[in-house]
Design a protein with these regions (language model features):
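A conserved hydrophobic secondary-structure block that centers on an alpha-helix together
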Residues: 57-131
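Beta-propeller blade signature
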Residues: 49-51, 101-105, 148-161, 205-212, ...
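Non-catalytic accessory segments flanking enzyme active sites
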Residues: 1-78, 89, 178-210, 215-234, ...
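Blade-edge beta-strand/turn elements of extracellular beta-propeller
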Residues: 61-64, 105-117, 161-173, 212-222, ...
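Cap/lid segment of the alpha/beta-hydrolase catalytic domain
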Residues: 65-80, 89-95, 109-111, 351-355, ...
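A flexible loop/linker signature enriched in serine peptidases of the S9 family
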Residues: 39-46, 67-71, 90-99, 114-117, ...
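Short coil/turn segments that connect the beta-strands within blades of beta-propeller domains
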Residues: 32, 82-84, 127-129, 189, ...
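Active-site-proximal cap/loop segments of hydrolase catalytic domains
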Residues: 436-637
Length: 637
């Protein structure tokens, strides 16, 4: 199919031109060393590196381009606070399963220690003698990519010993659906244990272990599972949390573990009219940096530890920021600033001077001044006002004939933000409009926005997305014959569900790695953890609303469906590929029209990662060629 589309090669070539630029990630500091990723331009994978100073001599730590197996990928790292030891992860064929390796950064020696079958990170203990990590029950041979992953436990691995001797730190066999995460506070004393219960949406518990106590007992600090709690840091024995308890847009509170009842909590930063998205405690505990967002655009405020506002961090413009993290003692931090038309630019921020310094700015081969970035608002079916990002060529005419790519996600409290995406540029150069609505189910307005799109409220997400399409048509941007829709993972589910509901509203659709069978998603790998978001297929009360939108079950014979390109990967062990296989087969069998129903399967790849840049650009070019063909477009990049 793709080979017959004449613009594929030109799109693919243009993508290569756009990605051929030197890339340097936002660095972070551990001890006296700085760590970052680099890419010279068109390297298949970025290279993880370090330097003793900013701008100093670079030492390559992990270069995935040298791995013998091209489907083995670098999957992250964890560096000790003093910058002397590194745990680093590899994954095979894009699987969520990780193998952990260890390197002495003083000598460059790769240690003999290796940890297998992890789906989590690791947390170094206070004296760097070992790491805490979580493990599920080991999968049966032959079922590594499909078997349910349950019964998580926290273990401790001491360097120099085999994994079989790792000691058990915490396990609740009576709670097989608890998901556990371990993190060591910067004080080197308190091990935090985060607990997520699959039956409770957007809530978690926080327990801790005082590693200096004689018995090292697990203390249930916050165990009601009634809100979200993010532990920022322990300062002088007091725990600072960001929480949405009694504050849907989040606040910061201080909890003394010796008297943790709520009447003893101290509110440090109250809830505001904007969404508090993150907070960091730096400067030896003197400063809280708090990141706020509202309708996709960010601001950063400074507070002292008592909650007195010290000022606002000056940002380069209107856009989004990532970063501002670090260790408690740090007096410098780093951030990346980006917007849809402003490529990610890296800055160093000094807490001592309250000034930002430009470190790195990419050079993209495109005239971004030829395009407009804006936010529009539309009414959904129930009168709710929904914001939507839009990107389009400056010379656009509202004549109803513009090609539109409408992209959605709408789930798990994930917020759409104004960030640069290089891969969008060819679409704009082809005369296309890019639209990204902030539909319910996401986190753009906090807890209530998320809760409005879960479980029995899931149809609200789909109707918000349909309302976005209708707005674009009614406003003269486009028409049904010129509209394509796209989404990945939860967004793939959205696209497939909307396609069933309104096949007349779109000309093309590209659902990627979506959950398509809502009655069986919980039977594979970590699918059971999504029951709080989707509903429980084993609960008779939930089956009715799950069946009401399940993409696989709502494909109808005799319907003229638009053109569809379904994408999945054969080693996806998060959303197993069977979802896309069976949905695609059913859609092909039911199609009453002439439009193609295509299934694109990536070999030896997972839900994300593993494939190199060239293959990722192949996939992007295929999708744009598909849209170009099915929407009857004329321009090519």
């Amino acid at each position: 199919y793709i080979g017959s589309i004449r613009v594929y090669e030109s799109i693919r070539g243009r993508l290569s031109e756009l990605y051929d630029y030197e890339y340097v990630s936002m660095p972070y500091r551990r001890g006296e060393r700085y760590f970052f990723h680099m890419n010279k331009g068109l390297q298949e994978h970025s290279v993880f590196s370090m330097a003793d100073s900013l701008g100093g001599e670079i030492t390559v730590l992990v270069d995935p381009n040298t791995f013998e197996d091209e489907r083995r990928s670098f999957a992250g790292s964890s560096i000790t606070d003093d910058g002397t030891l590194m745990a680093w992860f590899t994954s095979s064929s894009g699987s969520d399963w990780k193998t952990v390796h260890f390197t002495n950064l003083e000598t460059g020696e790769v240690l003999s220690d290796t940890l297998f079958w992890l789906k989590s990170g690791v947390a170094w203990n206070g004296d760097n003698s070992g790491v805490f990590y979580t493990m599920y029950d080991l999968p049966e041979e032959g079922e590594e990519y499909t078997q349910e992953n349950r019964n998580q436990k926290i273990l401790f691995h001491r360097l120099g010993t085999p994994q079989e001797q790792d000691s058990l730190v915490y396990h609740r066999p009576d709670m097989p659906d608890w998901m556990l995460y371990a993190g060591m506070m910067d004080d080197g004393r308190h091990l935090a244990i985060y607990i997520y219960d699959a039956s409770v949406a957007a809530c978690n518990g926080v327990f801790f272990v005082d590693m200096e106590s004689a018995d090292r007992q697990v203390v249930e600090l916050l165990g009601d599972f009634d809100a979200a709690y993010y532990l920022l840091e322990a300062v002088s024995g007091v725990f600072y949390f960001m929480t949405d308890l009694d504050a849907p847009r989040y606040r910061v509170v201080a909890v003394d573990p010796s008297s943790p009842s709520r009447e003893n909590w101290v509110e440090i930063i109250p809830e505001s009219n904007q969404l508090l998205q993150w907070a960091s405690i730096l400067g030896g505990g003197s400063t809280i940096l708090a990141g706020y967002t509202w309708e996709g655009y960010d601001s950063v405020l400074r507070f002292d530890l008592e909650g007195n506002m010290l000022g606002e961090v000056e940002l380069p413009g209107r856009g989004s920021v990532w970063g501002f993290g670090g260790e408690l003692s740090d007096t410098e931090t780093f951030f990346t600033f980006s917007s849809f038309l402003n490529p990610g630019t890296v800055y160093r921020y000094s807490l001592e001077t309250d000034e930002s310094t430009l470190l790195w700015q990419p050079e993209i081969d495109a005239d971004l001044s030829a395009y407009t970035e804006t936010m529009v608002y539309y009414e959904s079916f129930d009168g709710t006002r929904i914001p939507m990002f839009m990107l389009y060529p400056e010379d656009i005419e509202l004549n109803g004939s513009n090609p539109v790519l409408l992209v959605g996600y709408g789930g798990f409290g994930v917020s759409n933000r104004a960030s640069f995406r290089t891969s969008i540029i060819p679409w704009l150069e082809m005369g296309g409009i890019y639209a990204l609505p902030c539909i319910r189910g996401g986190g753009e307005y906090g807890r209530e926005w998320h809760m409005a799109g879960i479980r029995e409220n899931r149809p609200t997400v789909f109707r918000d997305f349909i309302a976005a399409a209708e707005f674009l048509i009614d406003s003269g941007y486009t028409s049904p014959d010129k509209m394509a829709i796209s989404g990945a993972s939860n967004g793939g589910t959205l696209v497939a569900a909307v396609l069933n509901m309104r096949p007349d509203l779109f000309r093309a659709a590209a659902p990627t790695t979506g959950v398509m069978d809502m009655l069986r998603f919980h039977k594979f790998t970590v699918g059971w953890a999504w029951k709080s978001e989707f509903g429980d297929p084993d609960d008779p009360d939930d089956i009715e609303f799950l069946l009401g939108y399940s993409p696989y079950h709502n494909v109808l014979e005799g319907v003229e469906y638009p053109s569809v390109m379904i994408s999945t990967a054969d080693h996806d062990d998060r959303v197993v590929p069977g979802h896309s296989y069976k949905y695609g087969a059913r859609l092909q069998a039911a199609q009453a029209g002439d439009s193609p129903i295509l299934l694109r399967i990536t070999s030896r790849a997972g839900h994300g990662g593993s494939i190199g840049l060239s293959e990722a650009l192949d996939h992007a070019a295929e999708r744009y060629a598909f849209y170009w063909q099915e929407l009857g477009m004329e321009e090519s990049p």
